[in-house]
Regions:
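Class I S-adenosyl-L-methionine-dependent methyltransferase catalytic core
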Residues: 2-231
Length: 231
């Protein structure tokens, strides 16, 4: 089993609601990156795979919780999105502060998950981390659609960024771009993508950022409450 780098937070699980301060007068959403994620490992990687917890801003609505009395009598509104109820989201300006460059080898590939609305932000983030955008590496057809402002949405994307030269040697050259897998739980990505990357770079040092699973041959940088058993 590879190394897992986790945020301890005094052995308490972190939920979306733990990131809200009940005493905060303005009741605005806070995303203290340094509080919810650990420091990056002191190691260099040739392959980095990231699924950033994008902040979509959400819409104005009342703060609600499964704990009935937590916000009893609270009438102010705050910004929430559906993702907020599943995991801590982080704003772009805070994601850009993450020193991914410090763990990237001179020759490194970054694979980053994104959605249509976050495409421009993803390229900006990759550049802030010290990479150059190259192409769309994977397209995930979720086989079901969500409502969209322009067309019904049913795809997500993995963008490929490069730093330096293409890591050598590489493995498989026949990994397909299109991944057609029915959508599962919220934000859980198909294993076929990381399996494909592993086939492409079987011998390279690899790390998954904002990880949800523990994959053989990969280091993981992850919140404690997102850790699941090795598949």
């Amino acid at each position: 089993m590879e190394k897992i780098f986790i945020a301890d937070k005094q052995d308490k699980d972190i939920t979306a609601y733990s990131l809200y301060s009940v005493q905060q007068k303005e009741r605005t959403k806070i995303n203290p990156l340094e509080d919810i994620y650990p420091v990056l490992p002191d190691k260099k990687y040739q392959v980095i795979y990231a699924d950033p917890p994008w902040d979509y801003g959400g819409k104005m609505q009342y703060d609600k919780t499964v704990i009935k009395d937590e916000n009893e009598g609270f009438k102010k509104k705050i910004f929430l999105s559906s993702a907020t109820f599943k995991y801590p989201t982080v704003k772009l300006k805070d994601l850009k502060k993450l020193d991914v460059k410090s763990i990237a080898d001179d020759d490194c590939i970054l694979f980053m998950w994104t959605t249509g609305p976050q495409m421009a932000n993803s390229i900006e983030l990759g550049e802030a981390w010290g990479f150059e955008y190259k192409t769309v590496a994977f397209v995930w057809d979720k086989m079901v659609h969500n409502s969209g402002r322009y067309t019904l949405s049913q795809t997500e994307f993995v963008l490929a960024f490069k730093r330096g030269k293409f890591p050598q040697p590489r493995g498989a050259r026949n990994v397909k771009q299109m991944v057609t897998v029915h959508r599962g739980e919220h934000s859980v990505k198909p294993a076929e993508v990381i399996d494909g990357i592993t086939k492409m770079f079987p011998e390279k040092a690899k790390i998954e950022l904002f990880a949800r699973n523990n994959y053989v041959g990969w280091d993981n940088w992850v919140l404690r409450y997102l850790i699941v058993k090795l598949r």
